[in-house]
Design a protein with these regions (language model features):
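Short alpha-helical Gxxx[C/S/T] motif in the catalytic ATP-binding
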Residues: 140, 144
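Conserved catalytic submotifs in the C-terminal HATPase_c
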Residues: 25-30, 47, 52-62
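Coiled-coil phosphoacceptor/dimerization helix of two-component systems
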Residues: 2-14, 34
Length: 173
């Protein structure tokens, strides 16, 4: 029943984007608040998989002007995916960094990784990497991309099979 509720919620988010009824309520937000929210939201799942989550965060970083609810959802989804696709007793790094006039929030796992031929497709609605055994709707990354792009940001993956994946969300500041 939790899974059905999760899929229904994802479909609702997707329909808001597709119908042009995605409303943003931006406010000044510290990137660490988004990271902390994602960690708290995924705490039980991380404990169940015995995943170690490490946080990397600089002393000084520019605040973001974003809809914190939508971007917290994105970061939470990325961390949830990292936990689910990592091996048990896995290690995950979540953090933020400033590069020139941009702030990046990233989630890095050391799991199976994703073949480069799927790096673009994984952001398509309903796409699932062939052979994936982890349950999912194929909507989380698509919705994440929609939410990030609605803020003028970008999302991309850096991944190599057998070496894990890093998802990077970037906003100009």
């Amino acid at each position: 029943s939790d899974r059905l509720l999760e899929i229904t919620s994802e479909l609702l988010k997707m329909s808001q984007v597709e119908s042009g009824k995605l409303y943003l309520n931006p406010k000044i937000t510290k990137p660490i608040e988004l990271i902390d929210y994602a960690i708290k939201a995924n705490r039980v799942q991380a404990e169940r998989f015995n995943c170690q989550i490490e946080v990397e965060y600089p002393e000084k970083i520019t605040k973001l002007f974003v809809d914190s609810e939508k971007i917290a959802w994105v970061v939470t989804n990325l961390l949830s995916n990292a936990i689910r696709y990592s091996s048990e007793n896995g290690r995950i790094i979540i953090g933020a960094r400033q590069i020139d006039k941009a702030v990046e929030i990233y989630v890095k796992d050391f799991g199976k990784g994703i073949d480069s031929r799927y790096h673009e497709s994984i952001f398509d609605h309903y796409f699932r990497v062939p052979g994936t055994k982890v349950q999912g709707s194929g909507l989380g990354l698509a919705i994440s991309k929609d939410f990030v792009e609605a803020h003028g940001g970008t999302i991309h993956i850096e991944s190599e099979v057998g070496k894990g994946s890093t998802f990077v969300v970037r906003f100009n500041v």
